[in-house]
């Protein structure tokens, strides 16, 4: 078995080099038996076909329910990262960030474990490293394990994604390989480089043993763009809509759903990633074992810029063209008395992550093997963010009465669309694109840092055929101990409501106009050209004033010190220089760091210790192959946070233990047909933000999320039954049924919380989004709340301290379930003549059904998902079309912009509605293309297109009304591969 594994690893490394997206390469040393088999076959299979054959062989030989991708399969696809390769596997779906794969769900569950060579990876949460941070080129294979065994580390609810890197002692000759790609993103209109380099060798020192070393380097720098059109959905009784005299006909309550706020946001993101991987390995001359040192480090820096203009407030008015659609939403209507809030955003993300390990294994006898490993994984994330926004103000009214609100308002006509950004047209033309109509409203800077680290030790013992029982292949046992520390800090500078609360040195009302800033600071105010090509793939339903706006330059905003000094000058001598000012404080000559205020409500420190022991037996009875045993794990968690007043730290502790039995059975029904059965208990600890009793506020201090340190983990019992039939070379068909009973399901509840510090800095101009409590509960946290229907009603509530923070927090609920079917088929058509023999297909389908305790489908689970890949390879040329589809799914249980809309339509209908705030994502499909040409044995060329059809992402309320449309880049890649 060891020789076979080494042979598989060697072939995988050769695959990486052949396509050279990765940095590993060929020249590996297969076993003597494997070499003999190659000679007998007299066929060298490479490229996509080799990769699929190898994946089928590994799946067939494994005792678990598992799917495998070898590195060449990753390299051959037009896939930018591991996530986009994993989406080709049955039961796996992904989410994308700016069109790039970032999150993986296994059978609809995102609570998975991501490991490298069996050890933990670290990100800014529980799920491990972000797939955008880890180069696919570092890998020899990726396994998706759906049925665990006792020796595997606990913590996966959906499955374990096991990333495998190469070992240098598998190298036969010196390895040197390099790849160079240039990627073009069409919306960003940017060419970006990606470089991979690998070098490795091994040396035989005779009696001193064999030493090997491998080093890999990867660099990528890219710019991406995303266009986003959003609305906020409100619920109106027909009496609140002018010129409308009848209730809605298509909602249970008779209320109408109205998109009352609109904005267009073009985002541009720059991403730079540098990664290193070094492995040193030594084996003594006795060949009884080996020792290794793995060092992996990733640095990723990214800057995001965005502009928008939000049209808010106003009252809906029906016209002769107004109608109600089948979802109860109002269409073709007017909004009267709308105000404008232009915004500029800039955020930066810097992440440093590493995973280091020292370990080895030793065969004391032919039967007894021991192994151990000490590892450390750490991630440090620094994420500052800035915002600069304005408010439309009537200059003439301001001159007459500067103490009044003096908002500049306009009327607009809205024409909605089912899958495109709607049309928004102002009566007053470009009134909200003129600098003289805007006043400085707010400046905000946030400094957020997350440190996450794990120290782990494990020790394993394996004994083959104890008591000479041939049917007991091996008995394994081991221990593992970990110590985890997670810390999150946040500090903030916020200067709000400047347009209405600014006072000069004499205490008189003052205002700072946009055109004044433009004159005093040339180049600071711009009219970005991003609106001219907005949604150029998807199109817009009609004329849209949202794409024409004037804002503060994002290039200046990301220069924190430059913008801070400008704001200091603008507010010099004002009430904002007074410490304790309720709208914010800025010094006259200090630095950003000096003026930052620690957000004690956001501080979190979580310590976690786990201790695990397992016992496993591998059994063989002729046609039966069984892996059975159990894993016992103890967990101790300490959560530290500030009390609600922010005056002292409070420590809360939680302990629990789990016994996790499992069995995997494989039965050779026929020589080429395997029937599998697996059953297991699994657990997944709650994420750190679910455990931390701290508040994470949104930008307006209107909503927040909060953890619960008393949470028990997710616990589930799962069953799998599968049949696999293999035919020819690497061809297979498979079917699997799966069922998961999630016994301690986490559910989210909402309440209106009393958080004085946050309430003092609330953006109260969006009063209709702020929760209101009754008088008796004004200083309490309560689930009994409502919303103001008018500014006057809200002002009264604030005067009585009845406003609060709408807070979402998790709790352990009842059971939920996930069940489904997986079908897979792959075949190379090598029986066809000539060029036709180069064709092959790989396709799969997954059906998943899910339900939470409220009867609502679980997040991120599509009922139907399928992938189809058609490839052709012949005489050094290769091409592949890859299509991925998933149908509608619940994207978010609670989305702020749909929080008022549920199946019962409104909050105030007297019905408890668990679907209120649900957001569903429309069906998604993507078509990718790749082609390659091996010029000779050392040089290769590749061409890829990702997102050929440029499909938009559309999000809807549970009633079917569109609230968001997003569009991403179509990406083209040209690349060169070279090896020695």
Language-model features: where?
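Outer-membrane beta-barrel signature, preferentially recognizing the C-terminal barrel domain
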Residues: 338-355, 606-609, 683-742, 752-755, ...
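C-terminal beta-signal and adjacent terminal beta-strands/loops
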Residues: 741-744, 839, 887-903, 932-980
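Short acidic/polar hinge/loop motifs at secondary-structure boundaries
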Residues: 119-147
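Extracytoplasmic beta-strand/coil segments of soluble accessory domains associated
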Residues: 83-120
């Amino acid at each position: 078995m060891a020789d076979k594994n080494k042979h598989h690893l060697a072939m995988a490394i050769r695959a990486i080099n052949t396509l050279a997206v990765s940095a590993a390469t060929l020249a590996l040393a297969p076993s003597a038996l494997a070499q003999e088999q190659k000679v007998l076959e007299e066929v060298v299979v490479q490229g996509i076909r080799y990769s699929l054959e190898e994946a089928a062989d590994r799946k067939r030989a494994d005792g678990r329910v598992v799917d495998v991708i070898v590195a060449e399969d990753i390299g051959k696809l037009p896939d930018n990262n591991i996530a986009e390769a994993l989406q080709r596997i049955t039961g796996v779906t992904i989410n994308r960030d700016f069109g790039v794969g970032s999150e993986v769900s296994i059978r609809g569950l995102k609570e998975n474990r991501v490991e490298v060579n069996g050890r933990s990876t670290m990100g800014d949460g529980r799920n491990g490293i972000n797939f955008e941070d880890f180069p696919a080129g570092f890998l020899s294979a990726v396994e998706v394990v759906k049925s665990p065994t006792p020796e595997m580390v606990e913590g996966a609810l959906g499955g374990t994604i096991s990333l495998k890197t190469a070992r240098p002692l598998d190298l036969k000759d010196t390895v040197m390989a390099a790849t160079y790609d240039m990627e073009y993103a069409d919306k960003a209109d940017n060419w970006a480089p990606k470089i991979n380099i690998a070098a490795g060798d091994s040396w035989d020192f005779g009696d001193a043993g064999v030493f090997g070393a491998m080093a890999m380097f990867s660099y990528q720098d890219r710019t991406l763009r995303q266009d986003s059109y959003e609305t906020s959905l409100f619920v109106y009784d027909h009496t609140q809509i002018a010129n409308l005299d009848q209730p809605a006909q298509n909602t249970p309550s008779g209320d109408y759903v109205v998109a009352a706020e609109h904005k267009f946001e073009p985002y541009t993101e720059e991403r730079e990633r540098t990664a290193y991987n070094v492995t040193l390995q030594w084996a003594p001359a006795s060949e009884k074992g080996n020792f290794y040192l793995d060092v992996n480090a990733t640095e990723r820096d990214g800057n995001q810029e965005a502009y928008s203009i939000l049209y808010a407030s106003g009252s809906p008015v029906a016209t002769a063209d107004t109608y109600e659609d089948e979802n109860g939403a109002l269409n073709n209507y007017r909004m009267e008395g709308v105000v404008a809030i232009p915004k500029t955003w800039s955020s930066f993300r810097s992440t440093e992550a590493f995973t280091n390990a020292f370990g080895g294994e030793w065969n004391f006898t032919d039967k007894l093997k021991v192994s151990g490993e000490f590892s450390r994984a750490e991630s440090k994330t620094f994420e500052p963010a800035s915002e600069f926004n304005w408010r439309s103000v009537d200059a003439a009214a301001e001159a007459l009465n500067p103490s009044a609100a003096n908002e500049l308002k306009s009327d607009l006509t809205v024409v909605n669309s089912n899958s495109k950004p709607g049309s928004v047209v102002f009566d007053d033309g470009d009134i909200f694109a003129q600098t003289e109509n805007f006043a400085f409203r707010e400046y905000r800077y946030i400094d957020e840092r997350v440190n996450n680290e794990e120290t782990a030790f494990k020790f394993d013992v394996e004994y083959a055929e104890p008591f000479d029982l041939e049917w007991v292949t091996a008995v394994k046992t081991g221990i593992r101990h970990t110590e985890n520390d997670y810390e999150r800090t946040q500090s903030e500078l916020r200067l709000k409501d400047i347009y209405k609360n600014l006072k000069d040195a004499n205490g008189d009302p003052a205002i700072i106009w946009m055109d004044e800033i433009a004159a005093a600071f040339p180049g600071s105010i711009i009219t970005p050209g991003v609106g001219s090509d907005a949604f150029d793939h998807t199109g817009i339903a009609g004329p849209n004033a949202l794409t024409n706006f004037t804002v503060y330059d994002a290039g200046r905003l990301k220069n924190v010190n430059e913008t801070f000094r400008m704001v200091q000058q603008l507010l010099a001598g004002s009430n904002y220089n007074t410490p304790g000012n309720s709208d914010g404080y800025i010094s006259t000559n200090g630095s950003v760091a000096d003026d930052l205020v620690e957000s004690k409500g956001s501080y979190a420190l979580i310590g976690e210790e786990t201790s695990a022991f397992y016992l496993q037996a591998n059994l063989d009875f002729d046609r039966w192959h069984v892996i059975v045993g159990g894993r016992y794990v103890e967990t101790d968690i300490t959560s530290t946070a500030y009390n609600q007043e922010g005056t002292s730290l409070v420590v809360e502790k939680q302990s629990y233990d789990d016994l996790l039995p499992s069995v995997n059975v494989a039965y050779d029904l026929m020589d080429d047909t395997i029937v599998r059965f697996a059953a297991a208990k699994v657990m997944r600890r709650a994420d750190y933000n679910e455990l931390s009793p701290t508040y994470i506020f949104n930008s307006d201090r209107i909503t927040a999320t909060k953890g619960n340190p008393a949470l028990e983990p997710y616990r589930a019992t799962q069953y799998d039954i599968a049949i696999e039939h293999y035919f020819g070379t690497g061809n297979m068909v498979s079917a699997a049924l799966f069922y998961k009973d999630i016994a301690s399901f986490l559910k989210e509840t909402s309440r209106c919380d009393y958080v004085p510090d946050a309430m003092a800095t609330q953006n109260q101009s969006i009063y209709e989004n702020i929760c209101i409590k009754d008088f008796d509960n004004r200083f309490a946290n309560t689930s009994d709340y409502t919303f103001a229907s008018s500014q006057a009603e809200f002002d009264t509530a604030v005067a009585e301290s009845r406003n609060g923070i709408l807070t979402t927090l998790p709790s352990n609920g009842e059971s939920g379930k996930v069940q489904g079917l997986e079908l897979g088929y792959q075949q190379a058509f090598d029986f066809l003549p000539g060029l036709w023999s180069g064709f092959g297909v790989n396709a799969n389908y997954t059906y998943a059904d899910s339900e939470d305790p409220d009867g609502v489908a679980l997040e991120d689970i599509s009922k139907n998902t399928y992938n189809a890949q058609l490839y052709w390879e012949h005489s050094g040329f290769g091409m592949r079309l890859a299509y991925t589809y998933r149908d509608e799914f619940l994207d978010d249980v609670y989305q702020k912009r749909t929080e008022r809309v549920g199946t019962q339509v409104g909050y105030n209908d007297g019905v408890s509605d668990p679907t209120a705030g649900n957001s569903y994502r429309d069906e998604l499909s993507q078509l990718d293309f790749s082609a390659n040409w091996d010029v000779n044995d050392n040089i290769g060329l590749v061409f890829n297109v990702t997102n050929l059809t440029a499909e938009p992402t559309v999000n809807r309320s549970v009633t079917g009304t569109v609230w968001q449309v997003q569009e991403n880049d179509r990406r083209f890649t040209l690349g060169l591969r070279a090896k020695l």
